[in-house]
C-alpha cells in the first residue's frame, strides 16, 4: 500500500452550483501536472497505437447483442441535499424509476453517516453507489483503503453495486493519469476479493467520447478486472444525439466501445452509461458547461427520449442513468425557487410508464432520417418515432401520444424531431 511522497501543492475546490470541481486554470500547475505524468502519457500513447487498428477491425465484425431488459434499463441520479427527502422520494415514486445512482464523495467521507442515511431511504430501489475520488485519496492508498472499507461496510446491506471513480480523464476530478486511476481502482479490487466477494465493481468511468483513455484502462498489466464497464457518454457538445463525431452517432459510439471491450480481458462487455444529460440555457452558474453547449428545455426533453431510444436500440447497453433528478442547470427539476419540473420530467415519466416491461422488436432509420424504435408487450405494439426532417405519416388505426403522453387526434401527422408514440392493440 503506497502513499505519494511527490505531492503537488494544489486544491481542487468544489463548485456547489454544477456539482463538480472547478476547472484548473493555473497554467503553472497544469505544466507541473503534465510533467509529473509524462511517462504515463507515453504508455497511453503506445497502447493506443497498438489497439486502435484492432478496435477498428472489431467494429466492423458482427457483435453479439444483449437481450436488454426494459425493466432494468432506465435509471436516474439522485443526490443528497437537493430538497426535502420526502419530496425527493415522492418524485422518484411518481416517475416510477426503480434504478438509482447515488454519489458518495470521498472529500466528504467524514460525513459518511448522512450519505448512508440518504441511501437507506431508497432501500426499496436497485441502487448503484458512485464513489467520487479526491486528491488526498488518490495520493494516499492507506487512507483510500480505510475509506472504502467504511463505505462498503456501511452500504453493503443496501446494494452490492459500486462505481469506483468518476470522470477519470478530467484532471479537475483529481486523477492526473490513467495509471493513477488504475492504481486507485486496484485498492478497491483487492478489498473486494479479500473481504467483500459479493460486491460488483464498475469502472472505468471515462467521460465523453474519449476512448483513448478508455483503451488505457482496458489494456494494462494491473491485476484487476471490471465486473461491469461504465462510461459517462455525453454527446451534448455535438448537439443532438444523432449528430456525428468522427463519423459516429450515439449508436456508433456505443458499438465502438463494445468492440474495444471485446478485445480486452479486463472487463465484461456489460456496458452501463452512468451519466448523461444536456446543459440547460440561461441557468448560469448551475449549467456545467458554457452557454454555447446549452439547449432550451424543449430541446432537452426531445434529446432525452431520443438518447434513450438510440442507446436502447443498440442492444449493447444494459442501463442508462440520467444525471440527475434535481439540478437547475441540467436536471429534470429546478430547485432554485421551490421545485419546478422541467418538461423533461413528464417525458421521463411517460417513457418509463409505456416502455418498462416491453420487449425490443426493431430499429429502423431511412434516408429521410426517419427513426423508428419498435417495442411490444402482451397487450400492444408501440413505436417511438421521430424525423430530423419533416415528413407526413399515416396514423390510421393507431393511438398517437406526444412524448409527454398526451393524446394527439389525427389520422395524418407531420412528424418532426419531436418524438411521438404510435400504439396499436394486438389482434
What is the meaning of each model-derived region?
Residues 364-398:
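Carbohydrate-binding surface patches
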Amino acid at each position: 500500500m503506497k502513499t505519494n511522497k511527490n505531492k503537488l501543492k494544489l486544491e481542487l475546490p468544489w463548485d456547489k452550483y454544477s456539482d463538480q470541481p472547478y476547472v484548473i486554470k493555473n497554467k503553472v500547475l497544469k505544466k507541473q501536472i503534465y510533467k509529473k505524468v509524462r511517462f504515463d502519457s507515453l504508455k497511453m500513447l503506445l497502447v493506443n497505437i497498438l489497439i486502435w487498428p484492432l478496435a477498428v477491425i472489431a467494429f466492423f465484425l458482427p457483435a453479439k447483442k444483449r437481450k436488454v431488459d426494459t425493466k432494468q434499463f432506465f435509471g436516474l441520479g439522485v443526490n443528497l441535499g437537493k430538497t426535502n427527502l420526502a419530496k425527493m422520494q415522492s418524485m422518484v415514486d411518481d416517475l416510477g424509476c426503480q434504478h438509482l445512482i447515488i454519489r458518495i464523495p470521498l472529500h466528504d467521507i467524514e460525513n459518511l453517516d448522512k450519505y448512508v442515511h440518504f441511501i437507506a431511504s431508497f432501500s426499496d430501489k436497485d441502487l448503484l453507489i458512485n464513489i467520487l475520488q479526491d486528491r488526498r485519496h488518490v495520493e494516499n492508498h492507506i487512507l483510500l483503503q480505510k475509506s472504502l472499507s467504511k463505505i462498503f461496510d456501511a452500504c453493503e446491506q443496501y446494494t452490492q453495486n459500486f462505481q469506483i471513480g468518476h470522470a477519470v480523464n478530467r484532471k479537475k476530478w483529481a486523477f492526473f493519469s490513467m495509471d493513477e486511476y488504475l492504481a486507485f481502482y486496484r485498492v478497491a479490487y483487492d478489498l473486494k476479493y479479500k473481504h467483500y466477494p459479493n460486491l460488483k465493481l464498475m469502472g472505468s468511468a471515462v467521460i465523453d467520447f474519449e476512448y483513448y483513455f478508455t483503451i488505457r484502462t482496458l489494456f494494462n498489466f494491473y491485476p484487476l478486472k471490471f465486473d461491469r464497464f461504465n462510461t459517462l457518454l455525453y454527446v451534448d457538445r455535438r448537439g443532438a444525439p444523432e449528430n456525428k463525431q468522427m463519423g459516429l452517432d450515439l449508436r456508433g459510439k456505443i458499438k465502438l466501445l463494445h468492440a474495444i471491450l471485446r478485445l480486452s480481458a479486463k472487463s465484461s462487455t456489460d456496458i452501463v452509461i452512468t451519466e448523461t444529460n444536456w446543459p440547460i440555457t440561461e441557468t448560469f452558474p448551475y449549467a456545467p458547461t458554457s452557454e454555447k453547449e446549452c439547449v432550451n428545455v424543449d430541446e432537452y426533453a426531445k434529446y432525452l427520449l431520443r438518447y434513450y431510444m438510440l442507446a436502447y436500440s443498440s442492444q449493447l447497453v444494459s442501463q442508462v442513468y440520467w444525471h440527475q433528478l434535481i439540478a437547475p442547470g441540467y436536471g429534470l427539476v429546478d430547485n432554485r425557487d421551490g421545485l419546478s419540473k422541467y418538461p423533461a420530467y413528464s417525458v421521463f415519466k411517460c417513457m418509463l410508464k409505456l416502455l418498462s416491461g416491453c420487449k425490443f422488436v426493431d430499429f429502423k432509420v431511412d434516408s429521410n432520417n426517419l427513426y423508428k424504435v419498435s417495442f411490444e408487450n402482451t397487450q400492444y405494439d408501440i413505436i417511438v418515432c421521430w424525423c430530423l426532417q419533416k415528413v407526413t405519416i399515416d396514423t390510421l388505426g393507431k393511438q398517437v401520444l406526444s412524448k409527454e403522453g398526451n393524446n394527439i387526434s389525427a389520422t395524418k401527422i407531420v412528424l418532426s424531431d419531436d418524438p411521438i408514440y404510435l400504439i396499436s392493440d394486438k389482434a
